[in-house]
Amino acid sequence: MIDFDGYRPNVGIVICNKAGQVLWAKRFGQNSWQFPQGGINEGENIETAMYRELYEEVGLTKKDVRLLWASKYWLKYKLPKRLVRSDGSQPVCIGQKQRWFLLQLLSDENLIDLKTTKSPEFDGWRWVSFWYPVRQVVSFKRDVYRKVMKEFAGVLLNESKKPETVEKPRVERTEKRDFQKRDNQKREFRKSARMWNNSHQKGKAQ
């Protein structure tokens, strides 16, 4: 599916671990690395497309990740002329327009599987530092990567500032015990008052 301007709608995925590193994948049979990405099918919801690509490219499902952020705007890059192809029957694709998603891996990294389809996109992956991809991706994607990572950096910073949810220790209730103590004190006071009153009355009688 290509829009009127010649751009193919696409989703991009940044997967981070709890250490703040991001998943960096090697394209099949090439010495080229990038984030997982893929086209949006006609009539397909953007988020649905993202989860489909997540499974097809790295073997993860929705339950394996937590969605931290989705970019609000389309980001575009043009393909180099050598990569622009046209067979005459289809609109010419001059580049990609992308919506990006930031995911946190919840499951064990051993569940990452690059061979879920007959034609895998990648044949290797590793964790890299957060800003590493901006310097290493192919030049025509670099501006998009810079904008994406700048946006996602703020999200991860806010995530790191959130306090961990810690269950408050249960406090044993002592009110009942305190009430009993005060009731005993009242009874003792009334008993002492009666004894004093009786002795006082006897004194008057004498």
Swiss-Prot record:
Cross-referenced InterPro entries: Nudix_hydrolase, NUDIX_hydrolase-like_dom_sf, NUDIX_hydrolase_CS, NUDIX_hydrolase_dom, RppH
Enzyme superclass (EC): hydrolase
Matching Gene3D superfamilies: Nucleoside Triphosphate Pyrophosphohydrolase
Location of region: Disordered: 162-206
Single GO MF annotation: mRNA 5'-diphosphatase activity
GO cellular component: cytoplasm
Protein origin, superkingdom: Bacteria
Keyword terms, alphabetized: Hydrolase
GO biological process terms, semicolon-separated: mRNA catabolic process
Biased composition (Basic and acidic residues): 162-191
EC number: 3.6.1.-
UniProt motif Nudix box: location: 38-59
Span of domain Nudix hydrolase: 6-150
Function: Accelerates the degradation of transcripts by removing pyrophosphate from the 5'-end of triphosphorylated RNA, leading to a more labile monophosphorylated state that can stimulate subsequent ribonuclease cleavage.
Annotated PANTHER family: M7GPPPN-MRNA HYDROLASE
Family: Belongs to the Nudix hydrolase family. RppH subfamily.
Protein name: RNA pyrophosphohydrolase
Source organism: Actinobacillus pleuropneumoniae serotype 7 (strain AP76)
